[in-house]
């Protein structure tokens, strides 16, 4: 007998199937339904990609009909201990195996070689892993700890995978298109919802060891279909009870975790009966049900709730009453327990009644209704919505089907009616806590269906994208939270910033319009935001492209998986109508693929246009700021030109001709005719009071106005022009209006400015030369006066007899000489103003002339004395003092006149 070991990680469904057959002692090659894969790899088992997540083992699944479709098996590892079994038992199983008109195990996950799995032991012997005795494997404690750690890690990863965003819950039995297993929980992967297998487990009270009995030759196919799923007792198999106990423990763990709702035994029996009828119906023959089918159906039981007792006689009687009610045309309603796991099709319960003819279309009605009436676009709506409360979109789709076509496809369809008291009975069976959880889950499903049906696609905005799929009702709250917390990925120039700056609308239409100061502040903030965005632009582009590519890849994977699931269930579409529906589903998948690509591109275009809208608003603010600057510059430039004209007029007036018509410079006007003309030395640059010309928000150093030269006096007597680059320098003449002698342009000086500058420089040089020569002349005059005083003192000592006359004569000569000298100097200054530049030469010439005059005076006085000595003796001769002094010549000429 084989040993069944339950492992928390998944294994191939085919391996599970081989293990289940090996329990009965049947070789893998002898199992019917697996002969079509004998040429594939025999060395290694095939482990499917879409296996069940760890931590959720289920019962081993046996697939008895191609209409149910493939479904991944629970994660079990079977090590065959004793492969030898009696030949009689093997032959019995093979004989009792009901033949199936269609190919079995068609899913790609079940493509496993039927040859014996072999391996090599350390000694070199080849071991058949299925039929031979396997050696004992000793695992150390350290390896066990590692295995446990790996299992825990796998469980955590599975939980994260199941709860990640965008994954739908596992669909239920009645909601899936191909009647998936009724024991699916809400926490499983969507891969399970795509498969179409049916899981039928038994309670410990029923043995399913032996295969079904061969049908009688005269038995109708309906009875044969029921006997396919009926297990005859087979005593002497202790491992079956062990496996069922493990299944009970697993189901108890699921119920405790809230992933599996307990089920009523009576409802499960009716459900299993209808599923068996649906699976084993032969569409090629018209059958009539017999009482034998009812008897065989009474022995079938599905999974039972682990917290409910074994069905007793009273419950069996209640189940028979329910079956009778279903046969009379009242379908079983969807209960609260089935709401969490699945629903039973109401039309599949009336197939096995005794004495009623059932047509092929009526038998396949439950299979056909789901894929035909539910397009793939509303998969999330139709699979999870209850029949009592369908969404508006589902009602629309169902209403589109013509009534005549429905009557043609489904003859004898009866309107569903609820049997009284049935739902109350089901609620009483369930615990109170499970009732609350089931009700809460139904409310969540209803809310999700309303969101999917009642709204369009979510608004494409960065705020909704960053909040990771917030529902449309929570979008305003999400924007408020986003504005409070700040954006991590979003650029600084967002709708929130534009709304804060009051520029989310156009400036022309904004009430009230922004002032120049507000426009300047907005411009400063926008320029700062642009600069900050430039630092993170590359990283944000890479992140957005990566997220877009990931979303597109996920969408393509989902569509490919959905297409693979539809393709794998091609063997159940055996009617022409079914084939048309199958082709339509494939076309819908292709359309969805194209629509997903188009949606991605259109969303990208919408985002680009919205960003362009933001940038246009920011650019409008910047253009408004530039226009304000231009207007201010033109105003200031006009004022500057006006001041320039005034300065030129004042300069020409101050340098114009005088009243007498003679052009005079500043030096000549200061010395002519003793007039006190206003004279000012151009040496210091005066800062004008033009602060109003400075632009708002700019420093005086950044003023765009051209500056004027500032004339300063140098220490070496020459002049230098210093140009102030920041502020214009204008001249003041003591009056209210300012005088500007010249202006130097910023790029290139004008020729008129150069001429005015040269004239001012010449006038200044003349004035400096005049002042210097005048001071030297005063010094020379003082020296001459000192010299005269010394001579007078000497004369006094030499001629003491005539001191008074000598003093008077000297005073007269001094007065006459000083007056004549002053007149001469003034005359020379008036007539020859340029001679003032050569005062040193003039004074040297004057000194030479003075020396010559003294020499000539002495010579003339000597000659006069010698002539008088040669004259008559009666006349007096010259004294020694007269002969020595040159000024006595005048007296000698006056004495003969007096005599």
Swiss-Prot record:
<feature type="region of interest" description="Disordered">
    <location>
        <begin position="324"/>
        <end position="391"/>
    </location>
</feature>
<feature type="compositionally biased region" description="Basic and acidic residues">
    <location>
        <begin position="759"/>
        <end position="770"/>
    </location>
</feature>
<keyword id="KW-0812">Transmembrane</keyword>
<dbReference type="GO" id="GO:0016020">
    <property type="term" value="C:membrane"/>
</dbReference>
<keyword id="KW-0175">Coiled coil</keyword>
<feature type="compositionally biased region" description="Basic residues">
    <location>
        <begin position="100"/>
        <end position="110"/>
    </location>
</feature>
<dbReference type="GO" id="GO:0016529">
    <property type="term" value="C:sarcoplasmic reticulum"/>
</dbReference>
<feature type="compositionally biased region" description="Basic and acidic residues">
    <location>
        <begin position="266"/>
        <end position="281"/>
    </location>
</feature>
<dbReference type="GO" id="GO:0019934">
    <property type="term" value="P:cGMP-mediated signaling"/>
</dbReference>
<feature type="transmembrane region" description="Helical">
    <location>
        <begin position="839"/>
        <end position="859"/>
    </location>
</feature>
<feature type="region of interest" description="Interaction with ITPR1">
    <location>
        <begin position="521"/>
        <end position="567"/>
    </location>
</feature>
<dbReference type="InterPro" id="IPR008677">
    <property type="entry name" value="MRVI1"/>
</dbReference>
<dbReference type="GO" id="GO:0060087">
    <property type="term" value="P:relaxation of vascular associated smooth muscle"/>
</dbReference>
<feature type="region of interest" description="Disordered">
    <location>
        <begin position="32"/>
        <end position="110"/>
    </location>
</feature>
<feature type="coiled-coil region">
    <location>
        <begin position="534"/>
        <end position="632"/>
    </location>
</feature>
<comment type="subunit">
    <text>Part of cGMP kinase signaling complex at least composed of ACTA2/alpha-actin, CNN1/calponin H1, PLN/phospholamban, PRKG1 and ITPR1. Interacts with PRKG1/cGKI-beta and ITPR1/IP3R type I. Interacts with HCN4; regulates HCN4 channel activity.</text>
</comment>
<protein>
    <recommendedName>
        <fullName>Inositol 1,4,5-triphosphate receptor associated 1</fullName>
    </recommendedName>
</protein>
<feature type="modified residue" description="Phosphoserine">
    <location>
        <position position="382"/>
    </location>
</feature>
<feature type="region of interest" description="Disordered">
    <location>
        <begin position="695"/>
        <end position="722"/>
    </location>
</feature>
<feature type="modified residue" description="Phosphoserine">
    <location>
        <position position="670"/>
    </location>
</feature>
<feature type="modified residue" description="Phosphoserine">
    <location>
        <position position="106"/>
    </location>
</feature>
<keyword id="KW-1133">Transmembrane helix</keyword>
<dbReference type="GO" id="GO:0048471">
    <property type="term" value="C:perinuclear region of cytoplasm"/>
</dbReference>
<keyword id="KW-0963">Cytoplasm</keyword>
<feature type="compositionally biased region" description="Polar residues">
    <location>
        <begin position="333"/>
        <end position="351"/>
    </location>
</feature>
<keyword id="KW-0703">Sarcoplasmic reticulum</keyword>
<feature type="region of interest" description="Interaction with PRKG1">
    <location>
        <begin position="140"/>
        <end position="172"/>
    </location>
</feature>
<feature type="compositionally biased region" description="Polar residues">
    <location>
        <begin position="171"/>
        <end position="180"/>
    </location>
</feature>
<feature type="modified residue" description="Phosphoserine">
    <location>
        <position position="683"/>
    </location>
</feature>
<keyword id="KW-0597">Phosphoprotein</keyword>
<keyword id="KW-0472">Membrane</keyword>
<feature type="compositionally biased region" description="Low complexity">
    <location>
        <begin position="181"/>
        <end position="203"/>
    </location>
</feature>
<feature type="compositionally biased region" description="Basic and acidic residues">
    <location>
        <begin position="777"/>
        <end position="787"/>
    </location>
</feature>
<feature type="region of interest" description="Disordered">
    <location>
        <begin position="164"/>
        <end position="286"/>
    </location>
</feature>
<feature type="region of interest" description="Disordered">
    <location>
        <begin position="757"/>
        <end position="818"/>
    </location>
</feature>
<comment type="function">
    <text>Plays a role as NO/PRKG1-dependent regulator of IP3-induced calcium release; its phosphorylation by PRKG1 inhibits bradykinin and IP3-induced calcium release from intracellular stores. Recruits PRKG1 to the endoplasmic reticulum and may mediate the assembly of PRKG1 and ITPR1 in a macrocomplex. Involved in PRKG1 signaling cascade leading to inhibition of platelet activation and aggregation. Also mediates NO-dependent inhibition of calcium signaling in gastrointestinal smooth muscle contributing to NO-dependent relaxation.</text>
</comment>
<feature type="region of interest" description="Disordered">
    <location>
        <begin position="867"/>
        <end position="899"/>
    </location>
</feature>
<feature type="compositionally biased region" description="Acidic residues">
    <location>
        <begin position="788"/>
        <end position="814"/>
    </location>
</feature>
<dbReference type="Pfam" id="PF05781">
    <property type="entry name" value="MRVI1"/>
</dbReference>
<dbReference type="GO" id="GO:0045986">
    <property type="term" value="P:negative regulation of smooth muscle contraction"/>
</dbReference>
<feature type="compositionally biased region" description="Low complexity">
    <location>
        <begin position="699"/>
        <end position="715"/>
    </location>
</feature>
<feature type="region of interest" description="Disordered">
    <location>
        <begin position="463"/>
        <end position="486"/>
    </location>
</feature>
